[in-house]
């Protein structure tokens, strides 16, 4: 008889080794939650009162050490590995000293100590996992687990009881992911073992079955086509019941290894996937699903949209809502960013609780644009006996997480998987793949394995399961029934980002190696976990063989794995999730009526004061500036983004669309690494070493001589836009989708020209699982299909997710206000260099015209109606042919150059649209409302359309051009001169209805972003006055300015002498695409190298003249992870010597960009010459005396941002006149804008006077600079200087060959990559930053003489 499994699975840890626990404390300011708690309860009357000045907090570091492994005593490793750990984590505690004793006073009846952090007795947090992977790469063997928490101490006026403790508990922890720690007993025992499960999975109550996702995306019980496919308009091929809408394109594949070569340019397909998720679901599940569709993809851009409750003081949980919005967006966006994906567009829609209570359930929609070479999509036939492989570490999630998302997706883990597959894709063995399927949505391992196998089943071996699951099973001596339950609990019933593949059993190549062996080799080179789980078989289900010993025969190697289920310890069938979610509801229900929520009433317009109402609408989070979010996430780093959210000189987040260029670099002629011939897409000039000697110091000769006569070369890519109308979905679930699709069209029509039939839209659904949800959902998605068919655009439903949970028969169904939402994202292939419009107004005296799809003024479902009235008016249907006509009309006007700016009319109505255009252009506008209608009705109308800026001389031509399209056009206002303080003015019949300054309009519009910063950014104190001093950067390109403005750089190549540059990619990091493109564009042959290449021989970089380190790690704590990964290179003697030999070899250069690049050069002692005190002109040998313990003697580190937040900013930089930098010598004295992204964007010195020594030696390569292009205008305050400490933003070695920059000039190599080009040089044809890379190429070629 089976034993009682519940007795085997208590709520405490299961297995542990001999361990030792250490606790360390470090000084800290209050966290945002602690600060609010102290502010709210200090000195106030009530049941809980904190004494003033008696609250404090510290960082709390918990380290679990392994004392032994087998017969090996690991205790001698504790001290050196703890020193290394303290070094790596120093930035995370703001370089405070980590001490085993707290400096805070505790004890006494009224003293309260509250320690908290990630649940210690559960799965490691994602931060701890990523740090653990870094420590493993450094070969740290005694550090078992590291968690960073908080130590909060306060003194109360009352005695501490349960009620007081409950208040503190509710303020600081959530019990889902962050829990209170009780370390005393554990510290005495020296044991803090853990299970592999998150708290949600440990409870066992959560089941990963989303009824909406299943009903929308999976086949019906009778194998009928899924609803999502029925509602799609496309006739494209189906991949596992998922419609793939693709557009053609090109993509570069870069070589790996120790020989520089040309990249390969491949024909490719581009796909857009939209993923609907609920708060706390895995942030990268959509990206991992897309990887199963296109296994060798490159994701080049993403959108991230959030739905939530409007923060309100009256609600009583304003702090919680602000926190959820911020934490949720940050978790999704940063997971994408650290996967190498810029977030280029998105939205935020908040619902006032009086209109739609959400129970704090924040919803998210992410869309990712991925490109994959067509030639890599060939697969093998699926058969029995093929190998089933799992890639990636097992990091299970068993239920929804909660802010601050300590169990969020790991970009580090996903990067290792993507890099492994991309390397494998460059081998012939890639055709061995016969299956990569994955279930869409939030699904279990069991469901993913079921989707992987189109027929039959699999024989899996227990010894091949992840170690995290095996540690809970080995040696337990349980029955087969209990073993089955343990495997279910710890592996099959949880979700993870492991990627499963099926590979055929057949030798590849002359050596006869199996395909899985090629994949295993690629995984080892990229630090990716790899396991062959078993083989496919004919019998359905999963059949587990017990090879754990004790009669099982021991672990079985892949070649000996059988594929017959005979002798399996137990088997598990594949269950249909559709049958599990089927519910019957009453027939004959009026579905349409249930989806239309109307509460009509007469609006008393006179009760609304124009001034107050306009400002109220502009400050609503749905309308207001999203700059807090936009400036916290990477939006540029891959170098492919031509238009991101920021518009105009002030970088205001107003773009209606984004532009992403194809990930292909074609400016080379010759044979690629994959041996195909390639002709350059631009004219090249071959030069010799002697010619390089003559050209190297004459940069004015590098530019073409035809001035502005050169024809514009097309730059292919994609335009991407979002659309959603959540308020209108409340009014009508059927018609609301039409307005969301229309918003995609009105946004994207302002971009480069394309045919509307080329537009492809993907839809993601959040739906309330209440009564009749299936019938309502079917009605809504089919209405979307019909509308798209009338428009003539492609539509595919890509995911679904419940927005609210139905509690079953004993619970009341969700109320009628629970959310039903459909989010849309559209893409089209375009020439990104073609004419287009942004909201930035250009000229005084220009007129504004309003185009709309009809003459109705529409306040139904508007922000005004939602926020100000409490009413819901009926929505009129949208006429598809009028939307199509307006699209064609606007595109014609743009193509003919008749209009100069444009912005779609959407959230906030006409007044918000015009105000945003005025802010983007920094010039006033005057609007005139026709008589006979209340002006506020017109101002707040959200009738789909656009406002266009038209030069007065073009007005007649524009009106004439609109006539054939039947568009409704009105001249509504004028653009005012840029003199003095601009105003937004609204008149009617000669009377002023509204008038206010641009400064006041800006204050209202940015109020929500300011509120977010005040809550989550660090206190800037007196420097707060400078926080809005951002943007409007002047430029001074010195003697090269005219050449850059009027000409293009000549593209040089040296066919006689190979000029190679290595680009370093460390495990868990992303390929630095912008740097690779910049190098190839400037003449280099390149190759991506990893630690194995560096360690393979002392001369592992002998074929290269340049070494570039750029990009980000996959870890959330990017700079700390950078320190760890680079230290791994330093600790590996062979790799260290290879790097030092290269750095000291004559004629080489290195370029470190961003936090990772700067850390690399700092760790190898490149900048230590300032303290060398000799060594001649070069300052001596680089890295002299460097050892694996040298990290304690570092002179230079990176400083944290003053905001204590990630920053993504377009800043001004100045190259000092006296810099020794070889790469920057032709830019000396220049003041240029560039992109910077990171959490540590400043230089920190560990020796007094070091900055002065660096300056005197000419080792400072770059300074943060102010707005004005004047030498003295150094930037000393945040945000122009992100750290507000040292102005230094770049350093070089004493000989100038090695350069480290905190900005990324490779992402500003082309003028089209710039956030904004100053009006004075509006026709800029060459970015001065390209001169840096050309200088490196010519100098390197020159040195070969």
From Swiss-Prot:
Pfam family name, one? Tegument_dsDNA
* UniProtKB keywords: Virion, Virion tegument
Q: Give the CC-aspect GO terms.
A: host cell; viral tegument
Gene Ontology MF term list: phosphoribosylformylglycinamidine synthase activity
Q: Name one GO biological process term.
A: purine nucleotide biosynthetic process
State its location(s). Answer: Virion tegument
Which SUPFAM superfamilies does this entry report, sorted A to Z?
Answer: Class I glutamine amidotransferase-like, PurM C-terminal domain-like, PurM N-terminal domain-like
Query: What is the designated name of this protein?
Result: Probable membrane antigen 75
Q: List the disulfide bonds.
A: none
State the source organism's domain of life: Viruses
InterPro entries documented for this protein: Class_I_gatase-like (IPR029062), Herpes_virus_tegument (IPR010077), PurM-like_C_dom (IPR010918), PurM-like_C_sf (IPR036676), PurM-like_N_sf (IPR036921), Tegument_herpes_virus_N (IPR024346)
- Name of encoding gene: 75
